Amino acid sequence: MAKGQSLQDPYLNALRRERIPVSIYLVNGIKLQGQIESFDQFVILLKNTVSQMVYKHAISTVVPARAISHNNNSNHAHQAAPVQSAEVVEKVE
């Protein structure tokens, strides 16, 4: 596992395993919402009414709809701040 993925993989896996709704902001400002179905080194499968394959290089930010706890390889817990979620997919200007 590459050093850069030592936090990314456990974080995404916790979101997937707990079926936490997420908002994914792309570098072009598009906001996608759904649940992480699966992921690998290059893509995330995001499921809502349809499944979308989102390339990681296009992602700016992943925001969970509620706080989560996960452990990375150094056993430090991290909690994400809860955010309000909306059902509408929108472009952030």
Curated annotation (Swiss-Prot):
Location of the Sm domain: 9-68
Gene Ontology molecular function terms on file: RNA binding
GO biological process: regulation of DNA-templated transcription; regulation of RNA stability; regulation of translation, ncRNA-mediated
Composition bias type Low complexity, residue spans: 70-81
Domain of life from the UniProt record: Bacteria
One of the record's GO cellular component terms: cytosol
Region (Disordered): 70-93
InterPro entries in alphabetical order: Hfq, LSM_dom_sf, Sm
This protein's UniProt keywords: RNA-binding, Stress response
CDD domains: Hfq
PROSITE patterns for this protein: SM
Quaternary structure (record): Homohexamer.
Family in the record: Belongs to the Hfq family.
Protein purpose: RNA chaperone that binds small regulatory RNA (sRNAs) and mRNAs to facilitate mRNA translational regulation in response to envelope stress, environmental stress and changes in metabolite concentrations. Also binds with high specificity to tRNAs.
Protein name: RNA-binding protein Hfq
Gene transcribed to yield this protein: hfq
